[in-house]
A protein has these predicted regions:
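Alpha-helical residues within the helix-turn-helix
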Residues: 12, 23, 52
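Short alpha-helical DNA-recognition segment
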Residues: 16-33
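Short amphipathic recognition helices of helix-turn-helix/homeodomain-type DNA-binding modules
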Residues: 60-66
Length: 66
């Protein structure tokens, strides 16, 4: 099972820097960048925090692929 996401697209559309997003959700810039690139599996907590920050549903930010 793999996760894809729209984090970078949403962040850039809203003019949010990766550093600012990371600070706002309580994760390192390195972690946010890694998840944006699809280099890791996001935790449930990460998905909830970022979705809440964007005021979006988790499934609108993250997608599960088999």
């Amino acid at each position: 099972m793999a996760f894809t996401n729209n984090i970078r697209e949403i962040r850039e559309q809203r003019g949010i820097y990766q550093d600012d997003l990371a600070t706002a959700i309580g994760y390192s810039t390195k972690t946010v960048g890694r998840i944006e690139r699809g280099d890791g599996t996001p935790s449930a907590e990460f998905m909830l925090r970022i979705s809440k920050y964007f005021d979006m549903l988790v499934e609108d930010v993250f997608h599960v692929e088999d």
